[in-house]
């Protein structure tokens, strides 16, 4: 299977969108925007550890088949490899989430349940990709001894 380059593109999803804001050999960081009342598929990554950082809003995160956590930004949750999970936006304005994945592999995906007809289907391909806009954030590699700062709110 040909690897898709997700840099400088936004992946449109039925629940919102996501795009890659930083990647190196060991980690990929994605920015997710989830619309109110919408949720990601109940899915797992057999070989990948995932961290979710809720930047804005309130969310419900399903962990496995028996646990649900309600989160209010700022909040975080770590998800071990193989644990099925789903994230739902509860806030009127939706939610913004940073998703950290290691190792880097978008094909490491098993969809168990999906409200949008994607059960057992792979990650979206080029047909779902659009160009980033000028106000979309991309994390740069800071120079040694320096930090980079980003504002996720419009104010």
Regions picked out by a protein language model, each given a short descriptive name:
Residues 65-85:
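Short acidic-glycine-tyrosine-enriched beta hairpin
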Residues 30, 40, 67-69, 77, ...:
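Short beta-strand segments
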Residues 52:
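Structured binding elements
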Residues 38, 47, 67, 83-84, ...:
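A generic "binding-loop/recognition-motif" signal
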Residues 5-12, 86, 90-142:
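Double-stranded beta-helix
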Residues 6-44, 48, 136-155:
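A short glycine-rich, His/Asp/Glu-containing loop-to-beta-strand
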């Amino acid at each position: 299977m040909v690897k898709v380059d997700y840099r400088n593109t936004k992946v449109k999803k039925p629940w919102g969108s996501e795009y890659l804001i930083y990647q190196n050999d060991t980690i990929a960081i994605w920015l997710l925007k989830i619309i109110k009342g919408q949720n990601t598929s109940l899915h797992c990554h057999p070989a990948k550890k995932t961290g979710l950082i809720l930047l804005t809003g309130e969310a419900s995160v399903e962990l496995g088949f028996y646990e649900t956590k309600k989160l209010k930004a700022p909040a975080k949750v770590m998800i071990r490899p193989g644990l099925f999970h789903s994230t739902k936006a509860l806030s009127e304005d939706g939610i913004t989430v940073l998703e950290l994945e290691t190792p880097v592999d978008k094909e490491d995906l098993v969809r168990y349940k999906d409200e949008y007809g994607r059960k057992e289907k792979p990650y979206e391909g080029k047909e779902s990709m659009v160009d980033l806009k000028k106000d979309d954030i991309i994390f740069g590699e800071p120079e040694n001894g320096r930090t980079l700062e980003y504002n996720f709110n419009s104010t």
